[in-house]
Amino acid sequence: MFTINAEVRKEQGKGASRRLRAANKFPAIIYGGKEAPLAIELDHDKVINMQAKAEFYSEVLTIVVDGKEIKVKAQDVQRHPYKPKLQHIDFVRA
């Protein structure tokens, strides 16, 4: 099972997302269930190694946000067109 540490995003929008990517992080969102969608930021280097394994897409993942564990599945992964970089991930609550 994969466990990912995340932080709640303070800023949203194109400029904020670009600043995150320049800082070796990237935006993501957790949605689904009865709770409101949660915009988060993830560390790129940690997640890029995890997503190289097929289990990342098929198993339930645990994301820790502010000490609270959220069970999710990866729904959509957006990659850079030619660089080996992740741009954004959508997670759906499990």
UniProtKB/Swiss-Prot annotation:
Organism: Shigella boydii serotype 18 (strain CDC 3083-94 / BS512)
Lineage of the organism: Bacteria, Pseudomonadati, Pseudomonadota, Gammaproteobacteria, Enterobacterales
Subunit structure: Part of the 50S ribosomal subunit; part of the 5S rRNA/L5/L18/L25 subcomplex. Contacts the 5S rRNA. Binds to the 5S rRNA independently of L5 and L18.
SUPFAM superfamilies assigned to the protein according to its UniProt record, in alphabetical order: Ribosomal protein L25-like
Keywords from the named record: Ribonucleoprotein, Ribosomal protein, RNA-binding, rRNA-binding
One Gene Ontology term from the biological process aspect of the record: translation
GO molecular function: 5S rRNA binding; structural constituent of ribosome
Cellular component, GO, one term: cytosolic large ribosomal subunit
This protein's record includes keyword Ribosomal protein: yes
Protein name: Large ribosomal subunit protein bL25
Family to which the UniProt record says this protein belongs: Belongs to the bacterial ribosomal protein bL25 family.
Known function: This is one of the proteins that binds to the 5S RNA in the ribosome where it forms part of the central protuberance.
